[in-house]
C-alpha cells in the first residue's frame, strides 16, 4: 500500500510545520502534498529539501525550494505523485496547469502517476483530468474540504474525484469552529479570527485507489467518509 495525505491545512488551517509533517510520516503517510497555503509556515522553506516525502505545488510562478513531482518506489513499483494548482479563481500566480503537467508526463516512465489537483473549480478539475487522456493514472481533486459524490473511472481510464474532502472537525464549517466563521463571513466582523476545535466529532475523508497488479491500470476508486470511526463506503455501481 501507499498513502498520500494533503497536509496544507494541518497546522491550524495554514500550511504545515515540521512537527505536523513528522506526525504524518510517523503515522504511516508515505507522501505529503500541499496547495495554495504551501508557504504559510515560513519554516517549510528551511526543511522541505531536508525531507524526502513532501511535495509543493509544481506550477507556482515564484522560485521556491522543493519539488512539485516525485517518484516513490514501493515493492518494486514506481509511483509518481504530482501536486498541481488550478488556475480558475486562483489568488496566487500560477503557471498553466495543463502545460506543466505535460512537461512531467513527457519524460515520465513511472508505473503509476497520481496527480493531486488542488483547485476551486470542479469544472476545471474534470476538464483537466479528461485533457490528460490516459497519460496519468489518477486525478484526485483537493481544496474545497467537501467530498464530492462523483468518484469514477473516466472513459479514458483515469481514476477521478472532484474533491476527496477533509479530515478534521465534523461539526464545523470546513473544519473551522462555526461561530468564528459566522462572525467573520456572515456578520463581516473583521476583528473575528477563525478558531479550531480540538474536541469534536472527527471526520475522516479519503479515497482508495485500486490498480491492476500486472498492467498498473486503474480499476476502482472507493471514497471513504467516516465520522468517529463510523461511516460508509461509496462503491461505484
Per-segment meaning from a language model:
Residues 1-237:
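Acidic, metal/ion-coordinating pockets
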Amino acid at each position: 500500500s501507499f498513502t498520500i495525505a494533503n497536509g496544507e491545512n494541518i497546522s491550524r488551517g495554514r500550511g504545515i510545520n515540521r512537527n505536523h509533517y513528522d506526525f504524518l510520516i510517523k503515522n504511516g503517510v508515505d507522501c505529503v502534498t500541499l496547495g495554495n497555503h504551501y508557504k504559510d509556515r515560513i519554516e517549510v522553506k528551511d526543511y522541505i529539501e531536508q525531507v524526502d516525502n513532501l511535495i509543493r505545488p509544481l506550477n507556482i510562478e515564484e522560485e521556491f525550494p522543493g519539488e512539485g513531482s516525485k517518484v516513490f518506489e514501493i515493492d518494486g513499483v514506481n509511483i509518481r505523485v504530482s501536486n498541481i494548482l488550478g488556475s480558475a479563481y486562483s489568488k496566487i500566480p500560477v503557471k498553466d496547469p495543463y502545460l506543466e503537467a505535460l512537461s512531467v508526463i513527457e519524460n515520465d516512465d513511472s508505473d503509476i502517476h497520481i496527480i493531486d489537483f488542488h483547485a476551486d473549480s470542479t469544472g476545471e478539475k474534470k476538464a483537466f483530468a479528461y485533457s490528460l487522456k490516459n497519460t496519468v493514472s489518477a486525478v484526485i481533486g483537493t481544496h474545497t474540504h467537501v467530498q464530492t459524490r462523483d468518484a469514477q473511472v473516466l472513459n479514458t481510464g483515469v481514476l477521478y474525484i472532484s474533491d476527496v474532502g477533509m479530515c478534521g472537525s465534523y461539526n464545523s464549517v470546513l473544519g473551522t469552529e462555526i461561530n468564528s466563521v459566522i462572525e467573520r463571513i456572515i456578520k463581516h466582523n473583521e476583528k473575528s479570527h477563525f478558531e479550531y476545535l480540538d474536541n469534536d466529532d472527527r471526520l475522516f475523508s479519503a479515497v482508495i485507489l485500486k490498480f491492476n497488479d500486472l498492467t498498473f491500470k486503474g480499476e476502482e476508486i472507493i471514497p471513504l467518509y467516516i465520522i468517529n470511526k463510523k461511516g460508509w463506503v461509496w462503491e461505484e455501481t
